[in-house]
Amino acid sequence: MAYFDYTSAKPVDERVLEAMLPYMTESFGNPSSVHSYGFKAREAVQEAREKVAKLVNGGGGTVVFTSGATEANNLAIIGYAMRNARKGKHILVSAVEHMSVINPAKFLQKQGFEVEYIPVGKYGEVDVSFIDQKLRDDTILVSVQHANNEIGTIQPVEEISEVLAGKAALHIDATASVGQIEVDVEKIGADMLTISSNDIYGPKGVGALWIRKEAKLQPVILGGGQENGLRSGSENVPSIVGFGKAAEITAMEWREEAERLRRLRDRIIDNVLKIEESYLNGHPEKRLPNNVNVRFSYIEGESIVLSLDMAGIQASTGSACSSKTLQPSHVLMACGLKHEEAHGTLLLTLGRYNTDEDVDRLLEVLPGVIERLRSMSPLYRR
């Protein structure tokens, strides 16, 4: 098997699993309890919090643990907007954001907020001048990904931060970028930053929102007031410990790993683009080291994915969170592609356990798959 769907799901690193196990069977206390078991659990959560903050140079803020990146994005968008509505109700969101940002923004529109979507160019880069032009006295929030999870394009977040100059809060969804490129909240000027555990080989079902001390949010989940009152519900201690360990490993190893993945990525791109009428989606240079997003004329991405799976190669057509809808990717549509072009897309994402042999297998199988599918397409003519 050759797995090229690391953006959808990653395995838990064995070192992470080892760190988690004692908190499932031995140190199983509730962090809110006042006895020794609770103290040990509380101490473990705090240690993990510090490790996650350190990964993004987040000493100037706090980490709030959530059930994942989706909840963290909801907390950032809805929580910040609701808390700061008296300052204004104008929000800017990029057109290529994950649906866990776009749908909360749509929810806010129904609550009386005005949301404008920042357009992107053909490579998926946001138009910074649009942000500059649209900034108003009542603009309270701008939300932009650090890098796109589908096409891999890295956004000019530092430039955006300079344009904002503190006039509005900046939320950055760094789900796709942490562990792939440098993520430093001070350098990029983030007021809030979303991080996913599984995207750095930690357990699923846990994520975090880093929040600068000056940023004030309203909780979106109410209950016992855990996580400094911003996220109620007993903390998932084993998963949080695993998240912390994954952050610790990532901080030490990401640069070397990114360079290895970049080499594999470039090898795939160079060879796949030799196939007739194949095109790279996303920026040719400013892209994540693990991302290959290509489209093929005259065939559908779903057919390519199924054919590759039959050959023992796993890939995808886009975001796993919305790929079941069979709708064309809103990211690719925002980049100006036609419906049929967006439907012909194959997404290959590399990860920690990919090898040169995996790439060999992919490059051996893929050209034949494309040729076979095109031979059955009524649109294809040699």
Swiss-Prot record:
Its EC number is 2.8.1.7. One of its GO terms (biological process) is [2Fe-2S] cluster assembly. One of its GO terms (cellular component) is cytoplasm. It comes from the Archaea. Pathway: Cofactor biosynthesis; iron-sulfur cluster biosynthesis. Keywords: 2Fe-2S, Cytoplasm, Iron, Iron-sulfur, Metal-binding, Pyridoxal phosphate, Transferase. It is found in: Cytoplasm. Its main location: cytoplasm. Cofactor affinity is increased in an IscS-IscU complex. It catalyses: (sulfur carrier)-H + L-cysteine = (sulfur carrier)-SH + L-alanine. In Archaea the pyridoxal phosphate cofactor is not covalently bound to Lys but ligated by other amino acids. Catalyzes the removal of elemental sulfur from cysteine to produce alanine. Binds 1 2Fe-2S cluster per subunit in a crystal formed under reducing conditions; this subunit provides 1 ligand while IscU provides the other 3 ligands. It is likely that Fe-S cluster coordination is flexible as the role of this complex is to build and then hand off Fe-S clusters. This is Cysteine desulfurase IscS 2. It comes from Archaeoglobus fulgidus (strain ATCC 49558 / DSM 4304 / JCM 9628 / NBRC 100126 / VC-16).
